[in-house]
Structures are given as structure tokens and as C-alpha cells.
Amino acid sequence: MAYQSIEVRKSTPAIGAEISGVDLAQPLGNQAFQEIHDALMENLVIFFRGQELSHEQHKAFGRRFGELHIHPSSLSVVPEHREVLIIKADEKSTYVAGEEWHTDVSCDAEPPMGSILYMKELPPDGGGNTLFANMYRAFETLSPPLQKLCEGLTAIHDGAQVYGGRFGQAPPAGGFPRSEHPVVRTHPVTGRKALYVNRNFTTRIVGLRKPESDALLEMLYRHSETPEFQCRFVWQPNSIAFWDNRAAMHHAMWDYFPHKRLGYRVTVKGDKPFHRA
């Protein structure tokens, strides 16, 4: 794809691209916005470096892509900026958000379309990289009989497994979000099919006995985590990663304890996952 207002350099053949030639602190013109959107659709995750954003500018960039999402758990948010989630780990941390392969908040009935993570502080000796995986390729490289099987299945995504279990948070009124989604979802923009299960939130496949569900999910997890489907982003201060939750998974490396890593995430609302044959 030819770009006029931005420069795009692919990270790997499978997924990821670094974008340059744009200052995200400034209002985006229509052409720059459209080309950034196109780069995201083409590469599933896009990276920007050397960006200086206030919380308001971070939110303004996110709002160009849609209404902003409020996280369902009681994880830290920036005071007076409920749309900005604090992503932090240090010597006091007993867990780090995102250290399993996942798509963000897939337990919601309408999971986010994308997430925009802005990194401010990093460990002094490196580490804290984020891995991303192409879920189009995860589906497309399954054998045809397995593709057909998965296209007829749905799965339960349960927020209690993460927020109540790993994070130890008390459930909000009405409980943590819990939803049933197709195992293979159709991307609403590209029309391509992506595998849509993840270790964090998916608890079982509907209609299968537990041993069958567990075995199939584990096989799909292992397959979707194939290195050839991945890229790895090495963060620098003031870097941004913007990923498409509808067709990409990610995994945050926690290899820097007890050092500090601090970032801020804005998340864009999405729509209800669907499957089109």
C-alpha cells in the first residue's frame, strides 16, 4: 500500500509496522488519519516513537478512531481521566497486566476494537518488551477440517478469571463481564476471519465436554502462539503501540522485576464479534 503523509516500515512479514513522519500531539488531518487507519488494518499493530503526549492529547488521538472505552475492573486509572488506564509494574508488584497471551477485555459483550499504549518509563537494563501475534494467520494456517469445526463453535469469555482470580479484585455490582463469542470472528472492516480465543479470558467452548473443550483450546492457544505469526516491540520512552484487538493478540514480558515500567493506555470501543460464513 502506498502512503503519502506517513512513512511505514514493516516489523515482520506477519505483523507490525513502525510509523514515522507524524506528531500525534497535533490534530490529525484527514489524510494522515486515513493512512494511519489503513496501516493498522494492514499490519494489525503499528508503532510510533518520540511522541510527547498529554493525557488529553492521548485521548484525542484515540477518539479519532471511536468512542473511548472504560475498563470494567478497578485497575488504576488517571484521576480525572477515567479513559486512561495506568499500566505499571515495580518492586511491589505481584503480577503484571498482560503477561499471558490475550486480546483486551474479550469478556465484554462488545470488546474494544483497539488499544493505544503510551510508554513513559522503562527498566534501566532493558526488558518489558511486548509480543504481538496475527490471528488471521492463526486461523488461515489451520487445516480445512479444523477451520470448519472452529467456524461452527462459540466460546465463553469470563472476566472473573482475570479480574477476580489473578488480580484478586472484588466484583462490581452485577459481577464481572462474561460473554459468548464465536471462536472464529469476521473482521468488520477487512472481512477476513481471525481466531478469537485467548488464555486470559476464554474459559470453555460451548457444547463440548470439559476435557474436549480444554484439549481443543490448548491446541488453539499453542497454534496461535507460533513464533512465525509474531513480532516483538522493544519499547523506548515516549513510544506508542496501537493494536487491533479484533485480529491480534499480545503478551507483555515481565522480565524486569524489581524495576519499574510505566505506561498509559487508551482503549477504543468496538462492536459485537460475529462470524460470517
Language-model regions: role of each:
Residues 2-240, 245-277:
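Non-heme Fe(II) oxygenase catalytic core, chiefly the N-lobe of the double-stranded beta-helix
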